[in-house]
Swiss-Prot record:
Coiled coil: none
Protein name listed in UniProt: dTTP/UTP pyrophosphatase
Organism of this sequence: Colwellia psychrerythraea (strain 34H / ATCC BAA-681)
Taxonomy, superkingdom: Bacteria
Enzyme class: hydrolase
Keyword Hydrolase: yes
Record key words, sorted: Cytoplasm, Hydrolase, Nucleotide metabolism
Amino acid sequence: MIFMTNEIVNSTSTSQKLILASQSPRRRELLAQLGYQFSVQASDIDETVEKAETAYDYVLRLAKQKAQHVLDLLPEAERVYSYVLGSDTSVVFNGEILGKPDNEENCIDTLSLLSGNQHQVLTAIALVSHAGVKGQVITTEVTFKTLTKAEISAYWLTGEPQDKAGSYGIQGIAGQFVKTINGSYSAVVGLPLYETAQLLANAGFVGSIHTK
């Protein structure tokens, strides 16, 4: 589907096509916030962490693979003018990648680790095209207040943490858990606005405001 925010949004060339390789409504909203015209195509890849893989390497690999997967699905003639943006986010505590919770117990365990502590959120972006791959990783430090088990259980019942890396969504109810954040808020949500705008500008795309 095509997602547009207004009529003036366009690319510098009508031959260029931007595709977001994600089914995340949060990433779609963030990219639209920058004023780009783009289509959305979900990417289905294996997200298993490889042996001895660091969180940095993991998120960057997934961002690239998501974008490459979508590019490979396109008819060969379309690949010449298509640019696919992939992104991946992981919550990391003491070097351990904290995935999405399978159940309430898993959520309680994860948020108990984060309670009263600082953790890192790593978000990678990658732009894949016929010209190659460009990507980077943004690291943000987040500190939580101390949480009670009752608070965590109540949070689980809201349904918000059930599809979130690290068992929380900073843009929602869990925003009240955050004491401090050092880095990019939008990266924690799922797509770093500044870095994404820079990446797309360098590829020749123009949003609401041309970024240099």
